[in-house]
């Protein structure tokens, strides 16, 4: 997406607010991204992304898996951006990308490891194409929120970008069936 003046104004305001929140001892994992998306709806699409993006989604284990991947990559010398505090909806992901960007929206990191809430796929994947998307599992979670496992798998399947390589839990039949037309790698426990 082409960057315009509103993008830069938004970027500078939310970077300033994010720095202020951190000075006050806050993690600033949600609000800066929420404000950025309110001020500039295409904000996530305009930010430059790291060359490699690893997304982690599923009902359980997203934070653990994304933090393990993050730690392994850091231990091997990579420059990483990660939403390690679990702010995994669109605003949290926008905040994470913002924190890894310069004042001109260029990425300062080589790799992004992003925990992505499965219900946020329609709001995230139009702007971010993960190189890899790991699906840990898909279980019936909160009935009020997720209704049924097939409902969740359909949301993820319909929104995974076609160029994303999907890494799926082969022990979970529902998880191993998402994004049927994408390249796949399977793992088992």
Q: What is each model feature region?
A:
Residues 61:
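Conserved glycine(s) of the Walker
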Residues 87-92, 116-121, 151, 173-174:
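Short acidic loop-to-helix transition motifs that present clustered carboxylates
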Residues 52, 56, 64-84:
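A conserved segment at the C-terminal end of the G1
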Residues 112-141, 178-189:
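Extended acidic/charged loop-beta regions that coordinate divalent cations
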Residues 105-112:
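Loop/turn-to-beta-strand initiation segments
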């Amino acid at each position: 997406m082409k960057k315009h003046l509103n993008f830069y104004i938004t970027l500078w305001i939310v970077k300033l607010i994010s720095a202020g929140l951190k000075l006050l001892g806050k993690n600033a994992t949600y609000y800066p991204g929420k404000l950025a998306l309110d001020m500039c709806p295409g904000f996530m699409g305009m930010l430059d992304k790291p060359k490699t993006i690893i997304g982690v989604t599923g009902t359980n284990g997203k934070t653990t898996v994304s933090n393990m991947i993050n730690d392994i990559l850091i231990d091997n010398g990579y420059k990483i951006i990660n939403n390690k505090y679990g702010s995994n909806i669109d605003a949290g992901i926008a905040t994470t990308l913002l924190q890894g960007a310069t004042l001109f929206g260029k990425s300062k990191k080589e790799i992004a490891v992003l925990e992505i809430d499965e219900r946020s796929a329609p709001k995230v994947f139009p702007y971010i194409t993960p190189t890899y998307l790991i699906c840990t599992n898909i279980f019936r979670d909160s009935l009020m929120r997720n209704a049924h496992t097939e409902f969740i798998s359909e949301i993820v399947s319909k929104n995974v970008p076609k160029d994303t390589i999907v890494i799926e839990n082969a022990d979970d039949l529902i998880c191993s069936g998402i994004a049927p037309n994408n390249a796949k790698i399977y793992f088992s426990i």
